[in-house]
Amino acid sequence: MHGVLKVRTSEEKAKAQRLKELEKIESYNKLVKSFEELREKQNGRYDEISLSVSKLVLIENPEFYTIWNYRRLAILQFTETKENSELQVIYQNEMKFLEECIQRFTKSYWIWFHRQWIALRMDNCDWEREMKLCTKLLNFDLRNFHCWGHRRFILKHSNIKLEDELKYTTEKVEQNFSNYSAWHQRSSILPKIYKEPEQLLEKILEEFELVRNAVYTEPKDSSSWIYHKWLVATIKSIPNSNYIEVLKNELTQIYDLIELEPDCKWPIYTTLLLKIEIGGFEKQELLDIISQLIKLDPDHKNYYKSLETKI
């Protein structure tokens, strides 16, 4: 009928979508073909066109690692033919391009690897900007381990204070106790900040308080329990820490949690580890805990059985 808007059927929509996808695939294949023809023609000699053509492919498919290698070879060749000022411009442009890629593909290993490679070649990488980029991305996805890895890379190669990063991880774990990456980041920087045994011991005791809040809030989440396990191993390694008394106190605290969550495996598992570490408990008592864990978590039966060798 005239004047009546035609509504597409589901079949028509699917067909239109398929045609759109085919056009995109065809366009991508043409880009790849252009790149391969250029690479063959150049025969190991690179220029700005090398970067331009390879860029078009990577914008669509950042997992094409061969092309990232190609770009690095091109840039390495430029270091032999160009002035440093020209190279710095190339590096800056590369960082801008990579940021565009990251906005679309936040978890591509090859993008992050290439970004770090470029950053180390720059005379003055803007590390603060790098950190802000990671912070921005983590606000959208707190579990993006590429961002957390990049933050560690930044801390290693810059003068950014570890204390600031510790504060950041505190904010993140308090926002979400399930943030495994934030807990892991914490474990990697604490020993670097508190280098003296006395200082580290004092901080570790504070950390037991922090993680206690976490396990009481989210007792079934593994993140904070794994961090608790790291705290136990760390305090044990500190000379004159009187760690056995600390572990006994932890054991008492976790008993209280088990009363509230009798069917939660993590506090039960942690009591087993603590009792093995403290020593002096009856073997049958520990075997009973292992049997209880196997009932609660049969998928990890073999692991729990392996703990019998430590009793």
From Swiss-Prot:
InterPro entries with a match to the protein in the record: Prenyl_trans_a
A single cellular component GO annotation: Rab-protein geranylgeranyltransferase complex
Q: Does the keyword Metal-binding apply?
A: no
| Extent of the PFTA repeats | 49-82, 93-126, 129-162, 164-197, 206-239
Gene3D superfamilies recorded for this chain? Protein prenylyltransferase
Keywords annotated in UniProt: Coiled coil, Prenyltransferase, Repeat, Transferase
Q: Which residues fall in a coiled-coil region? A: 12-43
- Report the EC code(s) recorded for this entry: 2.5.1.60
Catalyses:
geranylgeranyl diphosphate + L-cysteinyl-[protein] = S-geranylgeranyl-L-cysteinyl-[protein] + diphosphate
What molecular function terms (GO) are annotated for this protein? Answer: Rab geranylgeranyltransferase activity; small GTPase binding
Q: Does the keyword Calcium apply?
A: no
Which terms does the UniProt entry file under GO BP?
A: endoplasmic reticulum to Golgi vesicle-mediated transport; protein geranylgeranylation
- First-tier enzyme category under EC: transferase
Explain the purpose of this protein. Catalyzes the transfer of a geranylgeranyl moiety from geranylgeranyl diphosphate to proteins with a C-terminal sequence motif -XCC or -XCXC, where both cysteines may become modified.
What the record says about family reads:
Belongs to the protein prenyltransferase subunit alpha family.
Q: Matching PANTHER family, A to Z? A: GERANYLGERANYL TRANSFERASE TYPE-2 SUBUNIT ALPHA (PTHR11129:SF2), PROTEIN FARNESYLTRANSFERASE ALPHA SUBUNIT/RAB GERANYLGERANYL TRANSFERASE ALPHA SUBUNIT (PTHR11129)
Question: Its quaternary structure?
Answer: Heterodimer of an alpha and a beta subunit.
Q: What is this protein called?
A: Geranylgeranyl transferase type-2 subunit alpha
Task: Specify the species.
Answer: Dictyostelium discoideum
Its lineage reads: Eukaryota, Amoebozoa, Evosea, Eumycetozoa, Dictyostelia
